A protein has these predicted regions:
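Mixed-charge (Asp/Glu-Lys/Arg
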Residues: 1-33, 39-144
Length: 144
């Protein structure tokens, strides 16, 4: 459990730092909320659920886009506005110096009906799939 907690905390701090670099003011809620941070820019507040990806055996990453272990469910607009998946590419891939931030609105996740995402750096997939289906959401900050 400590390992998962550290992965999650690292992800939250990485996303907060990235969003601060992009001009967002960041706040962290106190208590049990379904979102991890609030990002404000130009008077607009966005509730963000951060999902930190974990490296799998074959070099891809997996991140859950849902909540719950036994009773999985999709986040909805009453819970948060977007999910930002953090992928520590710079730590795990030699020659890649930037981490991945995949910005996906909850409406899009509900539309796609995906409980998890498999992520990898563009052009570094295996077999015929060289770019993951989620690449279009990488650094999609304008969607929030």
């Amino acid at each position: 459990m400590i390992g998962n907690l550290k992965v999650g905390t690292d992800g939250e701090l990485a996303v907060a730092a990235k969003m601060a670099q992009l001009g967002y003011n960041i706040s962290f809620p106190m208590g049990g909320t379904p979102y991890d941070l609030i990002a404000e820019k130009d008077g607009v507040c966005v509730r963000v659920q951060v999902k930190a990806a974990t490296l799998q055996k074959r070099g891809s990453y997996r991140v859950n886009l849902s909540y719950g272990r036994l009773n999985k469910g999709f986040y909805d607009k009453s819970m948060c506005d977007a999910i930002v998946a953090y992928v520590p590419y710079s730590r795990d891939y030699e020659g890649i110096h930037e981490d991945g931030f995949y910005v996906i609105t909850v409406e899009k996740i509900q539309e796609l009906k995906k409980f998890h995402a498999t992520l990898f750096p563009a052009g570094m997939g295996r077999g015929r799939i060289r770019t993951c289906m989620w690449e279009q959401y990488r650094d999609a900050w304008a969607t929030i």
